[in-house]
């Protein structure tokens, strides 16, 4: 199979530009559902006391870069958990989890790659296919990080993405530390923008599969090494 085409951070620049006028319909509905279920918002004052050690459905963190992309997206979700290693920056959190990806997730990716190659979509490889000898501090925007391209990174949030002819996906790993620094809530948000009917068709099986994969990856952030 062909190797994934290289991407640069610039290729996603339009996705990271806030819309001129946000339309809060889907996100408002999602926020309302979260409040009704009693889920703590990632940036709430009681986050560190209320957050569980199992993933909970939440919202894109207020003020995060990924929040700019939620409105108008075809699909988005967010999952939060109290981090087992609160001192790790967001990219290090992602790398730790990716390097220990469960076999069933990599197996699902191999199946996905075989099937989508029949309709001309990219082989992304496996989620665990990250450079084991490369530290988070060595990555620069535009570098490949497993199946994603690194778009931006900071002490509070890392954005990873990929683009193909059918859709664009951006994943955020956001860390909110307590004042003392001994606790942190990590929120993983996924935003998908589809380009055409193929993207919508692709999302039919991917949407439910993503639910299980996202929860498993976020759960790993809450589990110790």
Please annotate each region the language model reported.
Residues 52, 128-132, 140-143, 148-151, ...:
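Mature, function-bearing regions of proteins
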Residues 165-204:
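Beta-strand/loop substructures that line and gate deep hydrophobic ligand-binding cavities in soluble
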């Amino acid at each position: 199979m062909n190797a994934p085409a290289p991407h640069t951070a610039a290729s996603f620049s339009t996705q990271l530009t806030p819309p001129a006028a946000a339309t809060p319909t889907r996100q408002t509905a999602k926020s309302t559902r979260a409040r009704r279920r009693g889920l703590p918002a990632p940036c709430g004052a009681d986050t560190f006391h209320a957050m569980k050690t199992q993933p909970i459905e939440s919202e894109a963190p207020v003020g995060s870069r990924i929040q700019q992309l939620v409105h108008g997206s075809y699909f988005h979700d967010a999952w939060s958990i109290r981090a087992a290693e609160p001192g790790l920056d967001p990219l290090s959190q992602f790398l730790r989890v990716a390097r220990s990806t469960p076999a069933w997730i990599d197996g699902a990716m191999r199946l996905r790659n075989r099937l989508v190659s029949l309709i001309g979509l990219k082989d992304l490889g496996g989620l665990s296919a990250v450079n084991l000898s490369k530290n988070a501090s060595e990555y620069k925007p535009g570098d490949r990080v497993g199946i994603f391209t690194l778009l931006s990174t900071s002490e509070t949030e890392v954005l990873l993405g990929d683009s193909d002819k059918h859709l664009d996906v951006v994943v955020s790993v956001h860390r909110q530390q307590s004042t003392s620094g001994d606790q942190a809530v990590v929120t993983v948000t996924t935003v998908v923008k589809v380009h055409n009917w193929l993207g919508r068709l692709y999302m039919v099986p991917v949407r439910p599969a993503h639910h299980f994969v996202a929860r498993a990856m976020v759960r790993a952030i809450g589990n110790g090494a």
